[in-house]
């Protein structure tokens, strides 16, 4: 083994720190002792109960406007989603199964591209939170309380979807390696001398390689099944939360732009939230679309392995491999409710526009009723 380069060593440090962040937010608990699991769970449970209680009491003491209602909805969505992941992680820490997914982010990894992805996703998130904290005294009391309540859950959900993106990227690296091996085999079959191809030893050797590729493809499909099982529930809740954040901050951005004089920090803050959500959803859907496309490309390459003059065993293996790629697609889903791909992005954009128009209509209706009563 060669010693790691500086880039690999730095990447390993970044991924190791990211793993500790996952543990701190109770998003990973497989390697923790039971005492630590219980302490983490009770700590988060106390936080969630106290926050929900204060929100209910506060909501009953004031006359809630549309802006206030949106903040209560976002607080509920974000904290409930985080609580769901915490409970799932807590139960997963006591469950020992052979077929469960290992720690999704192994801090022994040193892939620079993974570390760069972590930094590219975390820096905008931390930048938005810096804007929130540095300008907190200028906000109204209800807005400061809203950001304080949602800060841990907001960061936890951001970190969780980043870990999901990294896991899909790691599997895609293996898929590309399998595709490369298949492409090499197809080129060898088309470039070797015809007399050598007629030998039984050559046919048996290629049949063994096809069988090995079939096994690799099956293992890759199983990795996607485990990703769906591990991240499916959290993905469903996170996508719902991200949709609500995108719609709400788009509405607040529209309100801030119409307000004179402009509040630059408020506009930048809403743009930051919108950018974070758009970046993470686009990255997740793009990498999942890449997984699906790579699987289809492997299926198309199998046609190049067909040998009319080959043995029956070889051609049967190629036919089975082709059927396997048709039935075992590399698809990532959120508990089978929907698949993550680029089509999901277009559907979400259309839904965002629809709900944004509805909120704007409610805003004008609320202001008209206020003026009428005044």
From Swiss-Prot:
InterPro entries: 7TM_chemorcpt. The chain crosses the membrane at residues 7-27, 37-57, 73-93, 113-133, 227-247, 264-284, 344-364. The gene is Gr23a. This is Gustatory receptor 23a. GO terms for molecular function: ligand-gated monoatomic ion channel activity; taste receptor activity. Expressed in the adult labellar chemosensory neurons and labral sense organ. Expressed in neurons of the dorsal pharyngeal sense organ of larvae. Residues 1-6, 58-72, 134-226, 285-343 are cytoplasmic. It comes from Drosophila melanogaster (Fruit fly). GO terms for biological process: chemosensory behavior; male courtship behavior; monoatomic ion transmembrane transport; sensory perception of taste; signal transduction. Probable gustatory receptor which mediates acceptance or avoidance behavior, depending on its substrates.
């Amino acid at each position: 083994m060669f010693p790691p380069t500086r880039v690999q060593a730095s990447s390993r440090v970044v991924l190791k720190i990211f793993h500790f962040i996952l543990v701190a937010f109770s998003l990973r608990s497989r390697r923790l002792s039971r005492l630590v699991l219980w302490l983490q769970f009770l700590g988060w449970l106390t936080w969630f109960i106290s926050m929900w209680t204060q929100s209910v009491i506060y909501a009953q003491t004031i006359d809630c406007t549309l802006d206030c209602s949106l903040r209560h909805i976002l607080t509920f969505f974000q904290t409930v989603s985080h609580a769901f992941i915490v409970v799932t992680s807590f139960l997963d820490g006591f469950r020992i199964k052979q077929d469960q997914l290992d720690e999704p982010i192994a801090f022994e990894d040193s892939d620079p591209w993974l570390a760069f992805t972590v930094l590219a996703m975390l820096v905008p998130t931390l930048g938005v939170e810096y804007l929130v904290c540095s300008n907190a005294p200028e906000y109204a009391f209800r807005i400061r309380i809203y950001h304080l309540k949602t800060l841990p859950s907001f960061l936890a959900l951001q970190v969780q979807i980043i870990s999901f993106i990294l896991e899909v990227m790691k599997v895609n690296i293996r898929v590309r390696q399998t595709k490369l091996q298949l492409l090499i085999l197809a080129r060898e079959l088309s470039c070797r001398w015809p007399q050598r191809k007629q030998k039984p030893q050559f046919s048996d050797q290629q049949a063994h390689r096809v069988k090995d590729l079939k096994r690799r493809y099956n293992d890759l499909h199983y990795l996607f099944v485990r990703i769906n099982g591990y991240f499916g529930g959290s993905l469903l809740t996170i996508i719902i939360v991200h949709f609500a954040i995108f719609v709400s901050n788009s509405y607040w951005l529209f309100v801030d732009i119409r307000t004179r004089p402009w509040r630059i920090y408020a506009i930048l803050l809403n743009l930051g939230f919108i950018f974070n959500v758009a970046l993470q959803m686009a990255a997740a859907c793009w990498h999942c679309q890449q997984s699906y496309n790579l699987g289809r490309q492997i299926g198309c390459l199998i046609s190049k392995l067909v040998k009319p003059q080959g043995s029956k065993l070889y051609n049967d293996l190629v036919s089975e491999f082709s059927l396997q790629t048709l039935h075992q697609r590399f698809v990532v889903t959120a508990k089978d409710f929907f698949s993550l791909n680029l089509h999901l992005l277009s559907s979400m954009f259309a839904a965002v526009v629809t709900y944004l128009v509805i909120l704007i209509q409610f805003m004008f209706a609320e202001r008209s009723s206020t003026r009428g009563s005044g």
